[in-house]
């Protein structure tokens, strides 16, 4: 174990390393890809994690202190390959780019984070199965109700609903099987078995700060994005909890993607009672979309029925099977 970023005296660091530490402080829950020339470099604990997960050589870098900072790096032209491997393991990655040409800059090159890639927000088609949605879900627990928002930023899907008990909530989670789930602190204390959920679904789960779930902020965020004066214009008049979940999710997407998310043009409320309630054990035993043993599509009901010709059709077929109408 090398020197820890938590124990460094920032004032003793080199200017570049001071900027690195400052940037890392803003993205504590992410691995920071820090662009230096033709490489993305990782330092301190990030370097140790990445070197272990990706089997890369761990070296050191002079940082202005008596002890060298742990370091590992990857070529920027091959970054997507390494990035995809980290995302598949459930990590979040903040990409800090050079915003100036080092050859034409005197002093420190200006750098800033241009995007944050997470399991539910990756846009790399090579890392995704185009026949299934890559969902990110937001859940908020307020006044004994659960507000749910689901989005797939690769296809523009954005849906919301509300449920009033844990059983129905778990059905929604298992039904959509999101790659990532964000929630409020109250959700983690609602009686849900968080660790079991993460392990069974291989899901990335994180609790966001409470300000994400501020009622007024969430409502205002949705109204501004969809250009409506009231939530009634979105069909969300009676979806108070879902509005909070959707607003928090949208803010999270804005922060990670660093763009306006204009391709999310519609938000669709739905009622869970219109669909068959299927618990996780039943889904598994019926082998709706994958077999029990091999976890493969071949041999499942989806494999038998799926004669679709396009990726969009394949996603729709999967949706019909996972969420059958009553």
Regions found by a protein language model. Give the residues of each.
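Charged catalytic and DNA/RNA-contacting regions of genome-maintenance
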Residues: 1-326
